[in-house]
Amino acid sequence: MSESGHSQPGLYGIERRRRWKEPGSSGPQNLSGPGGRERDYIAPWERERRDGSEDPSTNVMQKTPIILSKPPAERSKQPPPSTAPAAPPAPAPLEKPIVLMKPREEGKGPVAATGASTPEGTAPPPPTAPAPPKGEKEGQRPTQPVYQIQNRGMGTAAPTAMDPVVGQAKLLPPERMKHSIKLVDDQMNWCDSAIEYLLDQTDVLVVGVLGLQGTGKSMVMSLLSANTPEEDQRAYVFRAQSAEMKERGGNQTSGIDFFITQERIVFLDTQPILSPSILDHLINNDRKLPPEYNLPHTYVEMQSLQIAAFLFTVCHVVIVVQDWFTDLSLYRFLQTAEMVKPSTPSPSHESSSAAGSDEGTEYYPHLVFLQNKARREDFCPRKLRQMHLMIDQLMAHSHLRYKGTLSMLQCNIFPGLPPDFLDAEVNLFLVPFMDSEAENENPPRAGPGSSPLFSLLPGYRGHPSFQSLVSKLRSQVMSMARPQLSHTILTEKNWFHYAARIWDGVKKSSALAEYSRLLA
């Protein structure tokens, strides 16, 4: 056959027949039929030569069934001219597969494309799947595969994109605070900066402090939270009173300072209650008082009551620091703050009415009396018993938990005393002077130029070391029970919002307003 496809007359003779028989197999050959001889006796190398010399347009049409590798596709390749006019109504079904295949390629990549084409039996590449608009099977393709692709994309791509970030955020340690920040400023306004350090977890302990001016509240809170006695006081998280401030008779802390440790313990340091320096500042600087207060000393006392009532509502433990035993006005102040304390919101009216009294639903914190700068004679067992008995009598009518949660006898501070030595043991703890350790480093001498007496023995102090007592106090405070502050369990962030509402309620309290009118 020539390149044009017509037969040549001299090629069907005996010579051609014999020439083809020589290289071929010796099996039987069928020479019957008008075109059977040409179709049966074409050699393989002759077929390759003829295929290469054919028109490229026909070659493209012959390669299509080879790619799809489907015998039925050869029969369907002839009617493209008849289906060509039907192409214009096809764009409507074509738009859906193209748009809905995009999330499959973004979420699953090439795996989604192969997975969608394999069960349908169409061409592997995604662009060729919507090209042939055929019968009913083609019309079902935009609905069923797309529904499966959407589920796979949303079920696998979203978790893989979010889980690593969420997992890393949970594994990261909380941000460590290096110094305290303001929770309530000197103008008695609430500050929102502390919420950045809080987490969504419920295991939190809140410790507050109250005390007169110069008793060492900031130093005690720094030692309990993050510092040690050996560190420089200027590096404490709660700034202690400087020497210049002591000489001027001023106060270092104003408002309420906030600090949270890595153990998720919140410490609240407050300004001194009934402070004469704050009163002097109001009088000498001509600060304008709020309209509801007429006298400066009334305003100072109401500020102190607001802070104390706030701590009694939002703290698990409140430490009352005093540097001498004892000031009766301090206990009178504590009873007044307990009286004007905001009531704890009850879960329902039925439960509060069924209780019959406010004691069952009202919240009261643990109260710890800390005797700072204690002398040697204060650690005498007889003096210790008198102190416990007096505090028990002064706080006999209080609902605050001032006894039963802290004990110096159980800390092995007095190893010779029996556990029942104190008839009425209250939450009292004694801490000596911080500088007493340096004084004991110089042992007594017999004379100016003589050697020290008992140089091989430590000096008698009458009490354990300052570091040991602070460590025992810290362990007891941190191991105290954490009662529920509200009728619902509060996380750290929930506690912050709860405290903000309590502070706003304290400032607008009708009980405090009535008490201020009685003072005037």
Curated annotation (Swiss-Prot):
Positions with biased composition (Low complexity): 112-121
Alphabetically ordered keywords of this record: Acetylation, Nonsense-mediated mRNA decay, Phosphoprotein
Biased composition (Pro residues): 78-94, 122-133
Record region (Disordered): 1-94, 107-143
GO MF annotations in UniProt: identical protein binding
Basic and acidic residues bias: start-end ranges: 36-53
PTM statement from Swiss-Prot or TrEMBL: Phosphorylated by SMG1.
Superkingdom field: Eukaryota
InterPro entries: P-loop_NTPase, SMG9
Keyword Phosphoprotein recorded: yes
PTM-bearing positions, type Phosphoserine: S2, S4, S7, S32, S53, S451
Keyword flag Nucleotide-binding: no
GO biological process, one term: brain development
Chain positions found as N-acetylserine: S2
Role: Involved in nonsense-mediated decay (NMD) of mRNAs containing premature stop codons. Is recruited by release factors to stalled ribosomes together with SMG1 and SMG8 (forming the SMG1C protein kinase complex) and, in the SMG1C complex, is required for the efficient association between SMG1 and SMG8. Plays a role in brain, heart, and eye development.
Subunit and partners: Self-associates to form homodimers and forms heterodimers with SMG8; these assembly forms may represent SMG1C intermediate forms. Component of the SMG1C complex composed of SMG1, SMG8 and SMG9. Interacts with DHX34; the interaction is RNA-independent.
Family assignment from sequence similarity: Belongs to the SMG9 family.
Protein's name according to its UniProt entry: Nonsense-mediated mRNA decay factor SMG9
Species this chain originates from: Rattus norvegicus
Gene that this polypeptide is encoded by: Smg9
